[in-house]
Amino acid sequence: MKSVRTALIVLAGVAFGTTQVDAATLGDVAAALAAPAASPQATNDWTAFAKLKGAQWQGKAPKRGGDKYYWNGNVPIDGVGSGQVSLVGGQKALDSATVDWPKDIALAKVPEMLAAQFPKGTKLEQVRGACPDERLSGSRIYRATLAGRKSLYLHVQYAANDRGAATSTIEMEPQRNKGWIC
């Protein structure tokens, strides 16, 4: 009886576009990227992403391109839909993770979005707000610290397109990227 009830809940979730059982959250991506607090390095190695919920990686391992390694995959994002994750790093440790968000990000609602995507107890602190002359596009920078993990910086972006399309991304790095300007 319990399995029938669980199946009905999952089917209702699929039908109404709610939570997916095998979907990752931004918190899952951040936990895979950020090293444990006691670790001497800021980020984890590549294997931390091998078990990301629902991820379908392109290839079995990262591929070298120039002086960096790259690994891209499709991943269902809890409560949002199908997104993509792009990882960049050295041979052993990661430098960054970028999540291509499948929906438009409402910049005014970023705090609520992050709170819904990270586990309770995560410290989320806005370190840069709106840019001057921000109308259709913009970004925000947050510092996120999950319990027992090193901090990460999140660059939350929404870019409108003159053809009606838009791009929404969340970049994660262990240090604030100087390229994240207005």
Feature locations, PLM:
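Broad, structure-driven detector of short, well-ordered beta-strand segments within folded domains
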Residues: 78-89, 150-160
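N-terminal secretory signal peptides
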Residues: 25-87
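Short, exposed beta-strand-loop hairpins at the edges of beta-sheets
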Residues: 156-171
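Short, low-complexity, Pro/Ser/Thr/Gly-rich segments in the mature regions of secreted, periplasmic
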Residues: 167-182
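Sec/Tat signal peptide C-region and signal peptidase I cleavage site
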Residues: 17-23
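Bacterial N-terminal signal peptides that target proteins for export
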Residues: 1-8
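Mature extracytoplasmic/lumenal regions of exported proteins
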Residues: 136-143, 148
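Long, charged/polar, surface-exposed segments that mediate recognition or autoinhibition
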Residues: 80-139
